[in-house]
Amino acid sequence: MIISHKYKFIFLKTTKTAGTSVEISLSRFCGDDDIITPIDFADEAIRQLFGKKPQNYLDFDPQGNTYKKYFNHITAQEVRNIIKPSIWNNYYKFCFERNPFDRAISFYYFDYPQNRSIKFDEWLKNNYYTNSFINNNWNIY
């Protein structure tokens, strides 16, 4: 997830939609005050090749306690609850969604990266690909 004050946009990251690749690409254009959330270790190493790393995703109160935390797949409502209304109302907000069939294939390979003891059509028929997965990005946007 990225909030760019420099370019006035909010990128909300959905799952299984190349969100990490988009986040890595966008991160290199971010300014020092922008919010960039952490991603996994291997992808973070790639992002740092472009000179950016996670920043400003935690805020602390005067006693040093965390009170605002932005994270990878934070929902639009959670962001809206944290940021100032003027930012929410004036920044361009976007995310990406994927063709449902392509997304199912991607999730199948994600679910079974090495051992594909269950064939794709069987995986679909036996509800391994559930409605909760089909709908799991809806709360992000």
Regions found by a protein language model. Name each.
Residues 1-141:
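Membrane-interface amphipathic segments in extracytoplasmic regions
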